[in-house]
Amino acid sequence: MTFNDSKSMVYAGKVNYLKRGFLLYMCASCLLLVQFVIYLVNSNYWESLNFVGGFYYLIAALGQAFLFNLIPWVVLYLPFAWWRQMRKVGTMLFTCAIFLLNVLAYLNGIVFQLYKFHINGFVLDLAFGEGGNQVFVFNDTLVLHGVFIGLLILLFTLVVIFIAYRYARYVTSKQVKIGIYLFLFSCIAPQLTHAYAAAANVNSITEVSACLPQYYPLTANRLMLKLGVVKKEDLYVNNPDKGKGHGFVYPLHPL
């Protein structure tokens, strides 16, 4: 009887840890989603955004937030479900990952707002390479602003932890299934939508994709033609300038 009780307690502890992890993952993804939405609001596409483009971006941003949090969740959190004595370590590691991901997302948002591209190797070379202090000047005001934003992100991260611990016991298998379906839908549906939009020249969808970091939307013009979704003669009818690029136009006037 004692052995069975001990075994049931171990199982219950594992289930609670996984429930807490599910809430952590979902809330962390929502936190990152907010930053991705801010990318769009601060971009040049916001003024001309319509409902279709906005809804597409929201779902695509959610899928991207899910994917960004998936690796640290799987690597840093899930393995400790089978290591009872170290579960607090798993929670701490994933908490640090949430914080660092959001700090990086905030810095990336600044870069995207200023330069219209996301953090890449070129930007890192400028920042940390020779003469980087001449390219990026950090005065006292900027440092204080950075500290304030860091504390704000830390506060939101702690709120996520509080929600996970407070409401983990209310998580049901049905809610987990809904979360899985939402994950799959937000990762697959935007890709298929973009494949059609790229062939049908729906610019409200194709252009806003540039706001998402490390996002590589699907294009399948040949497949769309083969399936009869679009006609070959219609590929460039709606947008004769397709392929010339509209995110960056220089010079504004002929020289």
What spans do the regions from the language model cover?
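Transmembrane and membrane-interface helices of multi-pass
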Residues: 2-222
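Soluble catalytic regions of membrane-associated enzymes that act on cell-envelope
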Residues: 217-255
